[in-house]
Amino acid sequence: MTPIQFTFSSAFLLGLSGLAFHRTHLLSALLCLEGMMLSLFIALSLWSLQLSSISFSSAPMLLLAFSACEASVGLALMVATARTHGSDHLQGLNLLQC
């Protein structure tokens, strides 16, 4: 494993562990998801540059578009829950009451 691969895999695992262990606020969960998507985007970009193939060059842009959609939906959900529940604590949310 090269140092660059180790860096991006550890950044992804750090975001995953942050998502798994620090789930108090919805904003912190969204930031962990964005960190994971950013590390995947950079790793996929470097991988497509190493392969020098035309078919893999559009994959990072597609991932970036999905990441932007995920961020906008996440922020819209956070605003909606903050308006209805008064905070963004994940423990206060119950799917049966929404």
UniProtKB/Swiss-Prot annotation:
**One of the GO biological process terms:** ATP synthesis coupled electron transport
Its record classes its membrane topology as: Multi-pass membrane protein
Q: Which UniProt keywords apply?
A: Electron transport, Membrane, Mitochondrion, NAD, Respiratory chain, Translocase, Transmembrane, Transmembrane helix, Transport, Ubiquinone
Mind telling me which residue stretches traverse the membrane in this protein?
1-21, 26-46, 59-79
Q: Name one Pfam family in it.
A: Oxidored_q2
Gene Ontology CC terms, in alphabetical order? mitochondrial membrane; respiratory chain complex I
Q: Which family does it belong to?
A: Belongs to the complex I subunit 4L family.
Per the entry, what this protein does is: Core subunit of the mitochondrial membrane respiratory chain NADH dehydrogenase (Complex I) which catalyzes electron transfer from NADH through the respiratory chain, using ubiquinone as an electron acceptor. Part of the enzyme membrane arm which is embedded in the lipid bilayer and involved in proton translocation.
Record's protein name: NADH-ubiquinone oxidoreductase chain 4L
> What organism is listed for this UniProt entry?
Tetraodon nigroviridis
Q: Which gene specifies this protein's sequence?
A: MT-ND4L
